[in-house]
Amino acid sequence: GMIVETGEESYETAPGETVGFNQDTEDFNEGRIKLIPKSGEIQFQSVNRGIGTPSYGGTIEVSLYDEGIVVVNEVGIEDYLKKVVPSEMPSGFNLEALKCQAVCARSYAYRQMASYGYPEYEAHVDDSTAYQVYGNSQPQERSTQAVNATCGEVVMYHGQIATTYYYSTSCGETTSLEAWGTPVNDENGYLQAVEVSGKVGDYEKDLPWYRWEAAIPVQTLSTLVEQNLGKGLGMIRDIQVTKKGPGGVVLQIKLIGENGDATVDTENKIRAALGGNGYEIKKQDGGVVPSSKLLPSAFFTVEKGADIFLIK
């Protein structure tokens, strides 16, 4: 069961009892609704994640906004990590790798706690890849072991907690904050371009996303560029990589269209400009997935064919 607080009033629910909220729920007239589990976790039956129906510990605050109902989960950092680490790294990985992931995730979380990522909701982060994936997997024994073994440990740089950006798969190189248009300085100098390799080659050379390619029809790409940039460039005649950054990341492209040209800067904006639905991404293991709103990476080259652009 749980305690439901609405304004100055509160009531308890029985174990297993379902409580529903919608835009017409009168309790919203009192402001936020707070849900406090008496024991265990609160399950969200209307939410679907990789594990199916997720459940959350800590307290839950439910608020009504013009755009819909917003759910904010307040949870202790170590309990949070027990659902982040298995969501970001398979629990079957080596324990030392999981411990590294736990330290990175903890460091990243503490840095985000310095300010609200969503000030309008008084929330530091969300549960997606925009920050760290949370709750897409239940706590796993090995992942929890890694979190417990590193409890409280963070990465430090010049007396401050480092911002530990990480990724699922590299192409054999990392890059610096220049990828996002941020100048390198004394505060972020630890984020450098390095080779991710050893004596037998790149560490990730056998992973599906180590190499990928997309053969995008010119018509499809032209339509996506117009949608993504809001500019009527017409049929795209060429894509030129005009600037690369540390590690080989693409920092600037020039789109040449029949009605004009456009320049796009920084990693995320470039991926967004060339992303969208309508084509397929082929991974090096032969697997094929539909395109999404972002190109998989900004480490790529472009080849122009008769009626396609080959990005890989």
Listing of model-derived features with the role each one plays in the protein:
Residues G1-K312:
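Conserved, single-site charged/polar hotspot
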